[in-house]
From Swiss-Prot:
GO cellular component, one term: extracellular region
Active site (catalytic residues): 5, 41
Taxonomy of the source species: Eukaryota, Metazoa, Ecdysozoa, Arthropoda, Chelicerata
Catalytic activity: an N-(acyl)-sphingosylphosphocholine = an N-(acyl)-sphingosyl-1,3-cyclic phosphate + choline; an N-(acyl)-sphingosylphosphoethanolamine = an N-(acyl)-sphingosyl-1,3-cyclic phosphate + ethanolamine; a 1-acyl-sn-glycero-3-phosphocholine = a 1-acyl-sn-glycero-2,3-cyclic phosphate + choline; a 1-acyl-sn-glycero-3-phosphoethanolamine = a 1-acyl-sn-glycero-2,3-cyclic phosphate + ethanolamine
Enzyme class name: lyase
Native source species: Loxosceles hirsuta (Recluse spider)
Official protein name in the record: Dermonecrotic toxin LhSicTox-alphaIV1iii
Entries under CDD domains matching the protein: GDPD_like_SMaseD_PLD
Keywords: Cytolysis, Dermonecrotic toxin, Disulfide bond, Hemolysis, Lipid degradation, Lipid metabolism, Lyase, Magnesium, Metal-binding, Secreted, Toxin
InterPro entries assigned: PLC-like_Pdiesterase_TIM-brl
Cofactor note text: Binds 1 Mg(2+) ion per subunit.
Amino acid sequence: WIMGHMVNEIYQIDEFVDLGANSIETDITFDDNAMAEYSFHGVPCDCRRYCHKWEYINTFLDGLRRATTPGDSKFRKELALVVFDLKTGDLSSSTANKGGKLFGQKLLQHYWKGGNNGGRAYIILSIPDLDHYAFISGFKEALKTAGHEELLAKVGYDFSGNDDLGSTRTALNKAGVKDREHVWQSGGITNCVSTLFRGLDRVKKAVSNRDSSNGYINKVYHWTVDKYGSVRDALDAGVDGVMTNDPDVIVNVLNESKYKGKLRLATYDDNPWETFKP
């Protein structure tokens, strides 16, 4: 999976897919009432990127729906997976549940069109703080209450704070997510900082967990990877996805002889919740 990083304006969906991304990551900010408000990152953000691109969340979800709805003039068949980087820092452990409920309702209305022929992409809820696990519980509850529990088949989960894997597993379980129930595990650091500061040790541990008989992880991705050498290192470590500001760099590496016969770009027909067995 080539995961286009910080796609917060609608026009960027085409920009990143044109460069080779089959997945995008979008930042979601919340207001004082725990309601998702904007697709927006703000400062600081990755080097070589403008940090202030934004849309109102409803507008962005409508645009995303069109990009992932077959038959729509804006449809991009390559775009199969969307990571919502949920900026829950302003939520508390007690308002996280409310935030999840409200976000579930918003996705149901603006992305899934009330469950009637909405966008088809798989969705990952990526949360930076283990203490906010109740966001997931609230999200699931919102879809169940609305009578659309079936949409949870399209939803996966990630904690992005580089926490201890055992603690991450506990937080997922508390949220009602079973081991290997649509679990992606991220690991990484901003592209402004050398990967020497946070190498691939944690990513390799996550890959080992994914491949063990008693792990909790389905897929592992590394962020934010823009340099050719770092991409090769991540692929050699066995990741399933690479989050990047430069999707074309990943495409070029995948076309190198070392990887060409071994790895390919995922399509919509590849289930992102199934652990890949080469």
